[in-house]
Structures are given as C-alpha cells and as structure tokens.
C-alpha cells in the first residue's frame, strides 16, 4: 500500500478529483487552502504581493495504482509548465483503518 500526496495550485482541485475518479479512487482527503513558498520568487500566500493558494490531496493506493497516478501527474506537470505549482510523492504505507 502507498500514500500519495499531491501539492498543487488550488485552481486545479476539480481536475485532480476528476483524475482520481477516472481510476476509481473515491477515498481521499483535500486540504483546500495552503500557503506555500516554492522558491524565493514563487509563492502562494493569497496576498496582493503573492496571490493564490495551493491545496494538498492525500490518498492511499494499492501499489499497482500508485505508479500510474504518478505517471499522469508527471504528464500534467509537463503540460502545465514551470509556472504552475505542483509536486507529488509516494510513501510506503503498512496499513490504514478507515
């Protein structure tokens, strides 16, 4: 089992949920508003100087789904370009009680 965390521009929340639905993933958690500092010149603090916010999506996947979802996120990141905040990582996970 794997824990997948995706950090992304909040504008793309519906797109993220849509991608998960396509793979039959209906259990996930979203932290809707996160203030992020991606670099010295790229931040989302929801202010007039640093507009926008990010979100975090967390889900737990069977091993066979994890790499496919990461592949899709890589494609999305390439399509969106460097100016859009997005990163993802997979962590091994022993068990979960939902």
Map each language-model feature to its residues.
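Positively charged, small/polar-rich N-terminal and surface patches that mediate targeting and assembly
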Residues: 1-98
């Amino acid at each position: 089992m794997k824990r997948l965390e995706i950090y992304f521009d909040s504008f793309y929340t519906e797109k993220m949920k849509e991608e998960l639905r396509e793979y039959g993933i209906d259990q996930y958690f979203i932290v809707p508003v996160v203030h992020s500092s991606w670099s010295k010149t790229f931040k989302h603090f929801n202010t007039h100087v640093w507009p926008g916010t990010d979100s975090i999506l967390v889900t737990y996947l069977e091993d066979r789904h994890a790499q496919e979802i990461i592949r899709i996120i890589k494609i999305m990141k390439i399509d969106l370009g460097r100016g859009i905040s997005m990163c993802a990582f997979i962590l091994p996970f022993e068990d979960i009680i939902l």
